Amino acid sequence: MTEQELAISCARGDRTAQRELYDQYGSRILALCRRYAADPADAEDLMQDSFIKIFRVIGRFKWTRPGSLYSWMARITINMAFDSAKRRRSLARQLVDVD
């Protein structure tokens, strides 16, 4: 299945296609998560959260060229990593303010 067909099938809720997408891109997304996460457990959580979001919004994906699916998934993952870091910093500031 091409990446374009894979994205369309995932958008239709095809569980087999979702499994294929995860199997095909999971290790690359996890490697990306490890660059942004504080520790391995955080990287696993980030990857899981990223795939949940990817599957939720994959209907918005617009295929433009080979490799665009991974680029789109990577951008979602990076944005989620930045959002998570912002939340952690905000929480840390709140905890410091309480002291």
Which residues are covered by each model-predicted region?
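Sigma70-family region 2
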Residues: A11-R12, R35-A38, F51-S68, R87-R89
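A short, charge-rich alpha-helical start-of-domain segment used by transcription regulators
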Residues: I8-A31
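Conserved RNAP core-binding helix
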Residues: Q4, Y22, L30, P40-V57
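Structural recognition of an alpha-helix C-terminal capping motif at a helix-to-coil junction
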Residues: D45-I52, R56, G67-N79
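Extreme N-terminal regulatory/targeting segments of RNA polymerase sigma factors
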Residues: M1-I8
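Arg/Lys-rich amphipathic alpha helix in sigma70-family domain 2
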Residues: G59-R60, T64, A74-V96
